Amino acid sequence: MKVLDFYADWCNPCKALAPVLDKVLEEKKLNLTKINIEEDDDADMSVKYNVRNIPTVIVVDDNDVEVKRFTGTKTEVDLREFFSNI
């Protein structure tokens, strides 16, 4: 499974989310590959996954089918809960 992190360099909420997301993924020791997707540079991926706002984080299975997503900033507690049943 993969974690698709849609962001933009100019997006302050994206900048705030990134280290917290990395920390939670590392703590959980999940078998997930994180892929950072710069929304401005990869519009095709944004269209494919219907990303309308950033930050957006999408978990996809090995066939690139969406499992779950969230949009906006999350606290560390929220992220732990989000990844708890993956």
Predicted feature locations:
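Structural micro-motif
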Residues: Y49-I58
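Conserved strand-loop elements at the edges of beta-sheets that form or border functional pockets
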Residues: I37-E39, N53, G72
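Extreme N-terminal starter segment of soluble prokaryotic enzymes
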Residues: M1-V3
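Thiol-based oxidoreductase modules, predominantly thioredoxin-like and allied folds used
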Residues: F6, L21, L25, K29-A43
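A hydrophobic alpha-helix adjacent to the NAD(P)-binding/active-site core of NAD(P)-dependent oxidoreductases
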Residues: S46
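Class I S-adenosyl-L-methionine
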Residues: K15, D22-E26, R80
